[in-house]
């Protein structure tokens, strides 16, 4: 993987989060001199901080990226397998919907622990270094010049061959690219926010089924719970900010949970629920799209800096990790030629990252509203049956996204085609059933339906036979 033509070339990665740290591993493995600049302090020694910590769902794409740098086994060993969605109805009834076949599962991963492991992996390379407490002040991407502010607040200019922007949804690197002509950008805050709650262990064990992603769908809002290695569950309540504002007091919160999530209260505990609910305000969720992802051969965006997505398909981290893997594959293909790799990365990756962004928006509606419907369950069973019957022709959308590396936009196209075929098949089947039912109904109501039809036809035929002077003419009768 490493190549002599990368030795001595310097890459600066802005952002030491998940994607930035993994990217640094890929680049260091290629013999680049890698410097990672992270605005926060080192989370491995920092005091516990709450905030942006929605549990992560690691699936096939992310695992393949980790595998490429030799980290898959280490990370997977610290995750909890989730084989199904466990749907909690308002009555307290629970029903499991498997994600795929018996061998397929996604992993619940702690964001904090994963980030710590990735930072440690970066520092294991002698040609890579992580600089904490350094904030990007100014960026000239065409020249590869950055101005950083360190802990002493003294500006320092840095020159490099490549700038990799992995600094999240509010990317400073992207803000500098937005000043360039022909750079498209859009962002959307969804009207819903999220709040993190906790279900502690019960008698030293999981309080619910551990190998499931638990969902309380309530149409306009929902709550989910992902298992942790310490036998607790991290719960996330997704709801519109207007609804959150209607819960200013402890009694309002308790009434709301008794009405909508009555089975969750004894699992959380009333006191713990109140403590967690008022610890932090609801956090916003943003979706970001931009194009292109690069500027010449000097700068490229990856992860949330390029395509922040809402978390409802569990693909934010996986898409970001796949960015790193795709870029690495392009570097192999084009011999580390940045002037070719960067534009090709934009061309190849933009349709996929925009597709998963749209799918994530769609999946929020499915998770909070559709999973309770009988039609949804019927579609899932039909998808499963057709996939078992024709595994290479019919592949469920979730399977394509979570358990393969089929490109995101191709998965969407294939999903639409499959839906069209299935809907036409159901229409034909429904028509045949309707015709058959009509025939049976007529046959049941009339004791001699066929004789009546036959006599009616005979009488009509006799009339035409007697009328010899009248003969129908058709084009082929000459």
UniProtKB/Swiss-Prot annotation:
GO molecular function: FAD binding; flavin adenine dinucleotide binding; kynurenine 3-monooxygenase activity; NAD(P)H oxidase H2O2-forming activity
Protein name according to UniProt: Kynurenine 3-monooxygenase
Binding-site list for L-kynurenine: 85, 99, 363, 398
GO cellular component, one term: extracellular space
Pathway(s) of this molecule: Cofactor biosynthesis; NAD(+) biosynthesis; quinolinate from L-kynurenine: step 1/3
Pfam families: FAD_binding_3
Swiss-Prot/TrEMBL GO biological process terms: 'de novo' NAD biosynthetic process from L-tryptophan; anthranilate metabolic process; cellular response to interleukin-1; cellular response to lipopolysaccharide; kynurenic acid biosynthetic process; kynurenine metabolic process; L-kynurenine metabolic process; L-tryptophan catabolic process
Additional detail: Increased in neuroinflammatory conditions. Inhibitors are investigated as potential neuroprotective drugs since they lead to an increased level of kynurenic acid, a neuroprotective NMDA receptor agonist.
Cofactor: FAD
InterPro entries (UniProt xref): FAD-bd, FAD/NAD-bd_sf, Kynurenine_monooxygenase
Tissue/organ expression: Highest activity in liver and kidney. Low activity in spleen, stomach, intestinal tract, esophagus, heart and lung.
Family to which the UniProt record says this protein belongs: Belongs to the aromatic-ring hydroxylase family. KMO subfamily.
Primary location group: mitochondrion
EC number: 1.14.13.9
Domain comment quoted from the record: Transmembrane domains are required for enzymatic activity.
UniProt subcellular location: Mitochondrion outer membrane
Keywords on record: FAD, Flavoprotein, Membrane, Mitochondrion, Mitochondrion outer membrane, Monooxygenase, NADP, Oxidoreductase, Pyridine nucleotide biosynthesis, Transmembrane, Transmembrane helix
